[in-house]
């Protein structure tokens, strides 16, 4: 029944709304009990670049887009908001904002996880004597106790993607935020917390375990905000929100927003949400998301593996007494790179890139190094093409870009195999770049694993909907969710990974040349 028609409120609430607030788009899907998409809406995220290396989002614009896509998707489904049983919200991680506790006024725009303003601070800390002392102390503690809780700080390094350093920057550079914090009047929130705060007109201030653990300020072993780290960085503990279950009744959206009070039944970080949407419920289940960034996640069950170079532990989700841990390896600028290649007219439509790459035997020695974080965690990595020749064509450039994605996938997968002591199952892929058959097949060849791609690659939206649906009773358990999964394509290894070794060795040399630019 179309939105707003008389009598539409009489229909039972049998639908769940899943919203994914990503780095490039805000998407909303309305799902029925069979997990079928009944209506959708999408808007482009408008990133701001006020200075070189800075990436921000206007909170009012993001709020307007968020509310807009929900209303549009429900209308597209021909439904009334009264028929929505639950709202689940998946959000990009580590993008944050601070605001005044009494007035609700932000002290600054959202600072994106892609923002590099803390690069100098990160480098200074990573080279500091204090951090070296911390490494020694916790290495000794781990040696004598065998407690893995001490392993993470023994190898602690800071990254520009983490919230911690950028939050420290805020209190050093925005006097209003610092003064409010000293008076216990400052609130910190990732995107989920801010949206919840706005939806409830300021009555609910909270986050969930998946979002909290992704900030780099939350201790996954103790499941609390890290007081030692906050003391080191002079960040007041009073700013942080309470942490709730991922699938949980967070309250209802104020009726002024959607016309009726819509139950908010899940908050979840986007990669953990995609993991849940892919039904990676068992230890050893592997999820590969290739969107704006690339993320490998392994379900490690109740085992929390400490950080290793290139990998870090996260809380996947908490539902009641169940806490599921993940190990993650990430790379940034996958989708961003492909969009850039389109903007400079290397191709017209992204769908043609796989065909372009296959039209030639190889990249003719051309290598592309995106400006993503490699194993050295170098924020000054230079994006570059290398090996260009007079015979180089657009096809060679496009193939080099796609190959770089597959090579980085191989690097991260090898680290996971080495460090995660759990037998790995079939890989499940999602995200926009998973629609590229060249990248998918090459990745399958390189890691020698079968990769499944679902019919709908918007797994973050589906995961948020699944979590909200469980909390509202629309679905009863995870076994029921598994039966709703639909696989569109399965990629199986077709070439021996050794055939790619010369090309990958050349690419790795190109990466080394681009470090510390």
Swiss-Prot record:
Signal peptide: none annotated. GO terms for biological process: glycerol catabolic process; glycerol metabolic process; glycerol-3-phosphate biosynthetic process; triglyceride metabolic process. Pathway: Polyol metabolism; glycerol degradation via glycerol kinase pathway; sn-glycerol 3-phosphate from glycerol: step 1/1. Glycerol binds at residues 93, 270-271. Belongs to the FGGY kinase family. It is found in: Cytoplasm. GO terms for molecular function: ATP binding; glycerol kinase activity. InterPro entries: ATPase_NBD (IPR043129), Carb_kinase_FGGY (IPR000577), Carb_kinase_FGGY_CS (IPR018483), FGGY_C (IPR018485), FGGY_N (IPR018484), GK5 (IPR037444). GO terms for cellular component: cytoplasm; mitochondrion. ATP binds at residues 23-24, 292, 335, 432. Its EC number is 2.7.1.30. It comes from the Eukaryota. Pfam families: FGGY_C (PF02782), FGGY_N (PF00370). It comes from Gallus gallus. Keywords: ATP-binding, Cytoplasm, Glycerol metabolism, Kinase, Nucleotide-binding, Transferase. This is Glycerol kinase 5.
């Amino acid at each position: 029944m179309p939105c707003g028609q008389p009598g539409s409120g009489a229909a039972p609430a049998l639908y769940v709304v899943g919203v994914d607030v990503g780095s490039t788009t805000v998407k909303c899907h309305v799902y029925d009990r069979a997990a079928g998409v009944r209506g959708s809406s999408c808007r482009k995220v408008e990133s701001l670049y006020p200075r070189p290396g800075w990436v921000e989002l206007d909170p009012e614009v993001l709020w307007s887009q968020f509310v807009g896509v929900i209303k549009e998707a429900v209308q597209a489904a021909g439904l009334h908001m009264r028929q929505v049983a639950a709202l689940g919200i998946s959000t990009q991680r580590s993008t944050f904002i601070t605001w005044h506790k009494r007035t609700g006024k932000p002290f600054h725009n959202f600072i994106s996880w892609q923002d590099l303003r803390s690069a100098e601070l990160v480098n200074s800390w990573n080279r500091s004597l204090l951090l070296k002392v911390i490494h020694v102390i916790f290495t000794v503690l781990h040696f004598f106790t065998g407690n893995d809780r001490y392993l993470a700080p023994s190898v602690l390094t800071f990254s520009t993607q983490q919230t911690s350093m950028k939050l420290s920057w805020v209190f050093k550079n925005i006097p209003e935020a610092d003064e409010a914090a000293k008076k216990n009047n400052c609130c910190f929130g990732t995107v989920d917390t801010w949206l919840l705060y706005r939806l409830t007109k300021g009555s609910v201030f909270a986050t969930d375990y998946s979002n909290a653990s992704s900030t780099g300020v939350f201790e996954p072993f103790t499941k609390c905000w890290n007081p030692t780290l906050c003391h080191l960085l002079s960040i007041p503990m009073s700013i942080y929100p309470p942490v709730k279950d991922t699938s949980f009744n967070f309250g209802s959206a104020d009726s002024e927003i959607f016309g009726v009070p819509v139950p908010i039944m899940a908050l979840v970080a986007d990669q953990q949400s995609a993991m849940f949407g892919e039904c990676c419920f068992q230890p050893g289940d592997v999820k590969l998301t290739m969107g704006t960034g690339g993320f490998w996640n392994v379900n490690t069950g109740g085992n929390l593996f400490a950080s290793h170079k290139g990998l870090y532990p996260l809380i996947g989700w908490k539902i009641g007494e169940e806490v599921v841990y993940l190990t993650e390896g990430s790379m940034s600028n996958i989708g961003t790179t492909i969009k850039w290649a389109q903007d400079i007219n290397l191709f017209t439509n992204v769908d043609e890139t796989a065909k372009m790459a296959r039209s030639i035997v190889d990249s003719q020695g051309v290598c592309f190094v995106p400006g993503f974080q490699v194993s050295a965690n170098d924020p000054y990595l230079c994006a570059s093409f290398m090996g260009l020749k007079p015979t180089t064509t657009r096809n060679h450039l496009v193939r080099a870009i796609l190959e770089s994605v597959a090579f980085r996938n191989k690097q991260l997968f090898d680290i996971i195999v080495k460090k995660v002591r759990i037998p790995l199952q079939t890989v499940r892929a999602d995200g926009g770049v998973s629609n590229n058959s060249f990248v998918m097949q090459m990745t399958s060849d390189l890691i020698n694993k079968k990769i499944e791609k679902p019919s709908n690659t918007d797994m973050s939206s589906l995961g948020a909907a699944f979590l909200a649906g469980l909390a509202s009773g629309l679905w009863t358990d995870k076994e029921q969710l598994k039966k709703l999964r639909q696989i569109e394509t399965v990629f199986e290894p077709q070439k021996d990974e050794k055939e790619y070794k010369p090309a990958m060795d050349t690419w790795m040399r190109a990466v080394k040349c681009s470090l510390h630019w």
